[in-house]
Amino acid sequence: MAELDAANLMKQAVGKAAADRVKSNTIVGLGTGSTTAYALEFIGDRLKKGELENVVGIPTSFQAEVLARKYGIPLTTLDVADRIDIAIDGADEVDPQKNLIKGGGAAHTREKIVDALAETFLVVVDSGKLVDKLGSTFLLPVEVIPMALTPVMRALAKLGGKPELRMGVKKAGPVVTDQGNLVIDVKFDAITNPAELEKTINNLPGVLENGLFVGVADVILVGEIIDGQPTVREF
């Protein structure tokens, strides 16, 4: 691998730690994002070396599918698999109760399906993703079907949020999810009850899913730099 900066060294270390927890003869949920990408790379390395056998993945996004094929991880689907032994995924924010905000990559709907079905949901983050309260540094993503965009934005504003349509980078127009929907990013001054807000938003007609993951994560692996060296801790 090429020389990495401190942030990527943390991501690489925590990705390897997650990959080391994968066992042979298992079905693995493959998450989305820059930290999870390292985990997929290391899983692929272990398969090539023969350290792992009979491991298949269920991707949470087109990005995860592309990376899995690149690194030689066989794939399956929820139509075929009868279980998910472990899911490895990143997060944009993690609070002390292991609640998450996800969706920076606009893949949170598929991620929530796979992560919630997993026997063990393992979250991989660098230390910059840890917050005291959700919403402190990251907007809350909400996936919405296109025809409901304006009504949902009005409803989110009534809930105290400041909604804005996520626009594409290096493309004209809004971000379009793998499901063909739009993403609204919402700023809340304080998310005091994540579980209640998650349910309230998901009950709005036209909302497919939002980026609050409450009570889903089992293990958080955190990459840190201590004395100039990347380390990983668990909580």
UniProtKB/Swiss-Prot annotation:
Organism listed in the record: Synechocystis sp. (strain ATCC 27184 / PCC 6803 / Kazusa)
Enzyme Commission number(s) from the entry? 5.3.1.6
Q: Which PANTHER family match?
A: RIBOSE-5-PHOSPHATE ISOMERASE
The text of the family note is: Belongs to the ribose 5-phosphate isomerase family.
Give the quaternary structure.
Homodimer.
Q: What is the protein name stated in its UniProt record?
A: Ribose-5-phosphate isomerase A
Keyword annotations for this protein? Isomerase
Report the domain of life of the source organism.
Bacteria
Q: Please describe what this protein does.
A: Catalyzes the reversible conversion of ribose-5-phosphate to ribulose 5-phosphate.
